[in-house]
């Protein structure tokens, strides 16, 4: 006999916990199913020294501050995970851990869905997929197995001691790739960093964090991504107290920058001749935000210290002006490649008709093309801020309101009019 509830929420990370708060506050019966522990990916699928990319005053839910992190500091991955555990306890979230959802199907000839799990089946009127975009590590099959002793995705990287002696190539210049490359260099490794197109906002400018600037400039609320920018790599770091990602500074410290990793043949990697362009475009995005911030300060008469030095960029290093286009891995002593090339969503368990030909959810603000199915925690779900901790909280409120409204219509048949 199947258990019954109104809503099954799949996943108890930031999206699932936020969803539970809004459903609970409106009295909607629901269950949150989590195959491991609350916020598991923060605990076991990130490197040891990871901290949040936004300050604690910003990267949180409205209802609870971090108890053990100063507002302008950056929470460690353990502190972030414990924050969500504490939040779930605070709101009394009905989370069941250690329960894996194996399939969700629409029930034949009647409303609602059958949710099959590792601990039996549940019938629900609504299902919220709150598993997020980081399900499946992805990296291009460029370098064959065995070409170097170790190839791993950034989700498997923990610390420098984990890798064999020798040089390391890090592929990907988003927050993960940059922080891992910097940590490896500081541990004494020779490091090559493959840099693609990216955005590198200032960590702080004129005394305020970039999260604040994006807020007052209205950029978190941008509703549709700029053309081609849906998956822009953002290079930002809260490591060591937080600092602006500066590829020139990395190069000056000994990291050798190369372009996009293009191909491999006979022990030699080839890189695209795009490094200077990628650096220049990232610089222009950085400078554009500074100019927008200056205009905002002037227009609103704010008393914030000027910071003209932030506009001054160091000369391009030799690795940019005369880029290396080939790397003989053995000759350079490269024994490890870390692919910081992102993730893909995995909705293999969600067997309903709401995906396009590329397997992407067909949805608007989390409301899917399949009535009763919702998505939460995806980039650009409603706005730029959607994949961030505070952004997903607001998206969850919208989804909960939609569920409550739909419940009202469904209740029409069972009430006196």
Regions found by a protein language model. Give the residues of each.
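Redox-cofactor-proximal catalytic regions of oxidoreductases
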Residues: 39-65, 250
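Flavin (primarily FAD) cofactor-binding/catalytic cores of flavoenzymes
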Residues: 2-44, 74-417
